[in-house]
Amino acid sequence: MTGDVDMSLHPSGIIPELQNVVSTVNLGCTLELKEIAMQARNAEYNPKRFAAVIMRIRDPKTTALIFGSGKMVCTGAKSEQDSRTAARKYAKIVQKLGFPAKFTEFKIQNIVGSCDVKFPIRMEPLAYQHQQFCSYEPELFPGLIYRMLQPKIVLLIFVSGKVVLTGAKERTEIYRAFEQIYPVLTQFRKR
């Protein structure tokens, strides 16, 4: 598991696992969505519901939203590299259907990670002492929402000790945010 990971970046000994990487690409041409949906077997298009073709591939297991403008959103990848690989595969599928698609402006838009600190957390005192960063309304949502400023990451913290981190453009932001919150969480450990 930790073979090629620099553990000096993870003093807590916990490495958040990437759950979803969202990227965008510009295929650089306009697309006939109906045409794509009819020809590609892994595609669905329901313009009354959503103005994009929804296409899926198995490897890497991802979903793409392909818009008539040639813009594409790729979601579901578990790493930045998988996101790029998948986006290239979708571009190739569109090319094979006869469109002059190029692969331009690839950009990671969001990375979501999660981990488990393996101890329960006292939510109310955490929310109170860090109220400038927190919103916690357990009757609406069971998680505490912690908006970190540096790096600019949103964390969902659950009483169980599970933590979800979102809003990163690169994985190091996920790691940094977790290493910053970890000592805070240990202070609010349920005894």
Curated annotation (Swiss-Prot):
Record key words, sorted: DNA-binding, Nucleus, Repeat, Transcription
GO CC annotations, alphabetized: nucleus
Record-linked PROSITE patterns: TFIID
Sequence repeat boundaries on the chain: 18-94, 108-185
Domain of life assignment: Eukaryota
GO BP of this protein: DNA-templated transcription initiation
GO molecular function (one): DNA binding
Residues of the signal peptide: none
InterPro entries attached to this UniProt entry: TBP, TBP_CS, TBP_dom_sf, TBP_eukaryotic
Chief place where the protein resides: nucleus
Subcellular location(s) of the protein: Nucleus
Family: Belongs to the TBP family.
Cited function: General transcription factor that functions at the core of the DNA-binding multiprotein factor TFIID. Binding of TFIID to the TATA box is the initial transcriptional step of the pre-initiation complex (PIC), playing a role in the activation of eukaryotic genes transcribed by RNA polymerase II.
Subunit structure: Belongs to the TFIID complex together with the TBP-associated factors (TAFs). Binds DNA as monomer.
Protein name: TATA-box-binding protein
Source organism of the structure: Acetabularia peniculus (Green alga)
